[in-house]
A protein has these predicted regions:
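Short, conserved SAM-binding/catalytic segment
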Residues: 1-5, 230-246
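Core catalytic lobe of class I
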Residues: 1-227, 265
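Conserved SAM/SAH-binding loop
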Residues: 12-17, 246-254
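Short, intrinsically disordered/low-complexity patches at protein termini
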Residues: 43-45, 109, 230-231, 240-242, ...
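Short linear motifs centered on Gly/Pro in flexible linkers and helix caps
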Residues: 53, 230-231, 260
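Alpha-helix boundary/capping detector
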Residues: 83, 101, 211, 235, ...
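Short, basic, helix/turn surface patches
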Residues: 135-143, 243-252
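Long, low-complexity, intrinsically disordered segments
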Residues: 258-268
Length: 268
C-alpha cells in the first residue's frame, strides 16, 4: 500500500463525479444511506411536547428526486464478485431499488432495523415509525460472516442515534448509530476490506469501518457534514495509533486528481 492514509479517503464532492474514478471490481462492501425522498410525502406537522414538531421534511436535499437507476450501473461495476450491497431506504423507495437491482444479482433481500425509541404518536392515530428497511444484494460467492443460525435473522434492533453520539453541530437529521453499522460491516466484510459510502453524511459508516479494521472511502456533497465526518474519522485514527498519522485533508478543487491520489487505496 503506497499511502499510509489509505484508511481515511474522505471526499467533499458529488458522488457521481467520484464513483467514475473507482476501478471495476474493487469495492468489497457498499454500505450507504441515500435520500429517502420522504419530504414529498409529508402530511404536515405532528406536535410533540417539549420539542419541535415532527414531520417528514427532514431537509431540502431530501425533496430533490432521487432515482436509484442512476446509481445501479456504477454500484454493480465497482463491486467485487464477492461483495455485498446494503442500502438504507424507505417504503416509497424500496420497490425502485428492487426493480433496478434484483435481476442483476443472484440474491436480493431486505433487513429491518427496529428502532426501540421511535417518536411517539401523541394522538394514537397510526403505527409508530419504528422500522427502517435496508435493501441488500449479493452474488453466490459473497462474503458472509455468521457463526450460527440464530444470528442470521434479517432483523436488527437498537435505539435511534442519541447523544452523546448524535452530533448537534452540525445536526444531521438521519444520522445512523455506529453500533448497527458495525454489525452490518461485521456480517458483510472482512478485516482490511474496502467499504464505500457515497452518501456519507457525518461519517458514521467510516467510524464503524475504521473501528473494525476496514478501509474506507466516503463521499459527501455537503461541506459542513463532510468536515464533521473528517473530524470524527481523524479522532478514531488518533485513538487507535499512538504515534498518530497526520490527517491528509484532500484537495477537493480538482476532481481529475482523485483517480491519481485517492485511489492508491486499491494498490497492494
Amino acid at each position: 500500500m503506497k499511502d499510509p492514509n489509505w484508511q481515511k479517503c474522505v471526499l467533499c464532492a458529488d458522488s457521481k463525479d467520484i464513483i467514475r474514478h473507482i476501478p471495476d471490481n474493487s469495492i468489497d462492501f457498499i454500505l450507504t444511506d441515500p435520500p429517502y425522498n420522504l419530504g414529498k410525502h409529508s402530511t404536515g406537522n405532528i406536535p410533540l411536547p417539549g420539542r419541535s414538531a415532527m414531520n417528514n421534511d427532514v431537509a431540502e436535499w431530501d425533496k430533490v428526486d432521487f432515482n436509484p437507476e442512476e446509481w445501479a450501473d456504477e454500484f454493480i461495476r465497482i463491486l467485487k464478485p464477492t461483495g455485498n450491497l446494503f442500502i438504507f431506504t424507505s417504503y416509497n423507495q424500496l420497490g425502485r431499488w428492487y426493480e433496478c437491482l434484483d435481476h442483476r444479482f443472484d440474491t436480493s433481500n431486505f433487513m429491518i432495523w427496529h428502532k426501540t425509541n421511535p417518536a411517539p404518536k401523541i394522538f394514537k392515530a397510526g403505527f409508530l415509525n419504528s422500522c427502517e428497511m435496508i435493501f441488500t444484494c449479493w452474488n453466490k460467492r459473497h462474503t458472509w460472516n455468521f457463526s450460527s443460525q440464530k444470528e442470521m435473522h434479517n432483523f436488527i434492533e437498537s435505539p435511534i442515534c442519541m447523544r452523546p453520539e448524535r452530533l448537534s453541530a452540525p445536526k444531521h437529521p438521519t444520522q445512523k448509530p455506529v453500533s448497527i453499522l458495525k454489525k452490518m460491516i461485521e456480517i458483510a466484510s472482512n478485516p482490511n476490506d474496502i467499504i464505500f459510502d457515497p452518501f456519507m453524511g457525518v461519517g458514521s459508516t467510516g467510524v464503524a469501518a475504521l473501528e473494525l479494521g476496514r478501509k474506507f472511502i466516503g463521499v459527501e456533497i455537503n461541506e459542513e457534514y463532510c468536515t464533521a465526518a473528517r473530524r470524527r474519522i481523524n479522532d478514531i485514527i488518533c485513538q487507535h495509533q499512538e504515534a498518530g498519522l497526520a490527517f491528509a485533508m484532500e484537495d477537493d478543487s480538482d476532481l481529475d486528481n482523485y483517480g491519481n491520489f485517492n485511489l492508491d487505496i486499491f494498490e497492494d
